[in-house]
Every structure is written in structure tokens, then in C-alpha cells.
Design a protein with these regions (language model features):
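Mixed-charge (acidic/basic) macromolecular-recognition segments
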Residues: 183-185, 193
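Surface-exposed amphipathic alpha-helical segments
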Residues: 194-220, 240-264
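Short Gly/Thr-rich strand-loop-strand
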Residues: 143-172, 204-231
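Short, surface-exposed beta-strand/loop micro-motifs that present aromatic residues
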Residues: 174-180, 232-238
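Short, isolated positions in well-ordered beta-strands
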Residues: 165-167, 187, 244
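Internal helical hairpin/lid segments
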Residues: 178, 188-189
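N-terminal, intrinsically disordered, polar/charged segments of Gram-positive cell-envelope systems
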Residues: 3-12, 20-128, 136-149
């Protein structure tokens, strides 16, 4: 009998304890669906838009920002892209005056905005080219800035550059030039007289490259100076009253790669 009574009392105590726990922990109603949806939307909107971020650091985006920051009325033409090292970003510094603009193009391992102060630090970005565009009072004045030469009429020792193109060599003061014409362009390679083969080799490489690539169409002429010693690569062409100059390019064939992107 005592065992039955004790079991009954233990069962009653368990029921009372369970009821007490239930009263102390009331059910918390679920949040309304609209509130949950609102919070999810807020969290989603706070995430960065990956597509916009990527678009802002593409070459097209960088070049658009370049043109926007120039704030010039000069009718200059910029390319859609430039040849840069894989895995790097294109950026630039800009400077504009009434009749002249200067753009220094850089490649960097990190994304740097146009005209970022960090571009003054050589270890943060590398100069790949400088573009200078200047407007003259007339097309005749602009044409005087182009060192155009018809090499077939200038004399010099004839040399075969391939692709049915003849070059003409001229030496003086320790320098050896190999020049030729392609359309409205006058192109010449420069080397030292103690390394004459290098000038012809570079000229042949340039001719072969231009077999499948087009330089900008000048109005009226253009000139290219390609240096074996990588110290004075210069490409200049006229577009009516405007004169485009590309320099600060170390490798001569890279200078041609930079120039062809201005073809349109």
C-alpha cells in the first residue's frame, strides 16, 4: 500500500512540475512573413553588387572614367582597351589644358581609380604609355609636327624586309636607321652601328606584325620611331588639327601594339 501511495505522489509531483514549466515558457509567436521578407530584402540590398564592381574596373570602365575626368572639348579618340599584363588593372593620370591633354596609362596589381594619389608611388603601378594630344590652329600647322619621309626618295642602302617591302638604311654619328613606308606612315628602326643586324631584325618583326594589324589612319601622315635599345620609342600621327603622340613605351613592338588599338 505504501508503495502504491508513494508512486501516486511521485506521479502527481511530475505532472505539477511539467505544468509549471509550460507556464514559465510561453510560446513566442513567429514573426509575420512581411517582416521576415523585409529583413531579407535589407540584407540582400546591403550586399555589394558584384556586377557593378566588376564593370567599374574593366578597361572600358577605366577608359570611360579617363574621358570623364579630362573634361575637355577636344574631339579626341580613345581606344576601347590597351594591351596590359594578364591579371593587372588599367588606370591612368590625366591632365587637360585648353588645347592639349595628357594621359599617362598605368597597369597595377590592385585596382586604383583614375588620378589616385598612389599612382605617384612607383611600386604601386607601372607606366605603360603616355598619350599626348595637341590641337593646332590649322591642319597645315599640325602636319609640320609629323616627321614624315618618303624613304624611297631619300636614298640609302636598300634592304629586303619581307612582304614585298623594301627598307632603306642610313648611318651617321654611330647610329643606323632602317626606314620604310606603309601607306601614309613612315616607320624607322634605330640601332647602333656596332649592332647593325638588330635594326634589320626589328624592322622585319615590325613589318610582319603590321601584316595582320592596322595602325591608325592618319590625316594626313604618321611616323613611328622604334628603338632597338628601348630608349626612344615614339609614334606620332595627325588627325586634321590634332596630333597624337605615344611615348614612354619601353619595348618597340609594344609601342606598335599600343598604337594599333587607336585604329577605328
Amino acid at each position: 500500500m505504501k508503495k502504491v501511495l508513494f508512486a501516486f505522489m511521485l506521479l502527481s509531483f511530475s505532472i505539477i512540475t511539467a505544468c509549471s514549466d509550460k507556464e514559465e515558457k510561453p510560446n513566442v509567436p513567429n514573426k509575420p512573413q512581411e517582416e521576415q521578407q523585409s529583413q531579407e530584402n535589407q540584407q540582400e540590398s546591403s550586399k555589394p553588387n558584384k556586377e557593378n564592381t566588376v564593370a567599374s574596373i574593366t578597361q572600358a570602365g577605366a577608359l570611360k572614367n579617363v574621358k570623364d575626368q579630362l573634361k575637355t572639348d577636344l574631339p579626341i579618340t580613345l581606344p576601347k582597351g590597351l594591351p596590359i599584363t594578364e591579371g593587372t588593372f588599367l588606370t591612368a593620370t590625366t591632365k587637360a589644358e585648353a588645347n592639349e591633354v595628357e594621359i599617362v596609362f598605368f597597369e597595377s596589381k590592385e585596382y586604383l581609380p583614375i588620378n589616385d594619389i598612389k599612382l605617384k608611388q612607383p611600386d604601386r603601378a607601372t607606366v605603360i604609355a603616355r598619350l599626348l594630344v595637341k590641337q593646332y590652329e590649322s591642319a597645315d600647322e599640325a602636319s609640320k609636327q609629323i616627321s614624315f619621309e618618303n624613304f624611297s626618295q631619300s636614298g640609302g642602302q636598300e634592304v629586303d624586309l619581307g612582304s614585298n617591302i623594301k627598307g632603306y638604311q642610313d648611318a651617321g654619328a654611330g647610329s643606323l636607321w632602317t626606314g620604310w613606308n606603309e601607306g601614309r606612315w613612315a616607320i624607322a628602326t634605330h640601332t647602333r652601328t656596332d649592332n647593325p643586324e638588330a635594326g634589320v631584325k626589328l624592322a622585319k618583326q615590325a613589318v610582319q606584325f603590321l601584316e595582320s594589324h592596322m595602325l591608325p589612319i592618319p590625316k594626313q601622315h604618321g611616323s613611328a620611331h622604334l628603338d632597338v635599345n628601348e630608349s626612344g620609342n615614339l609614334i606620332v600621327w595627325q588627325d586634321d588639327k590634332l596630333v597624337y603622340t605615344l611615348d614612354s613605351i619601353k619595348e618597340p613592338l609594344k609601342a606598335l601594339e599600343m598604337a594599333i588599338v587607336f585604329y577605328h
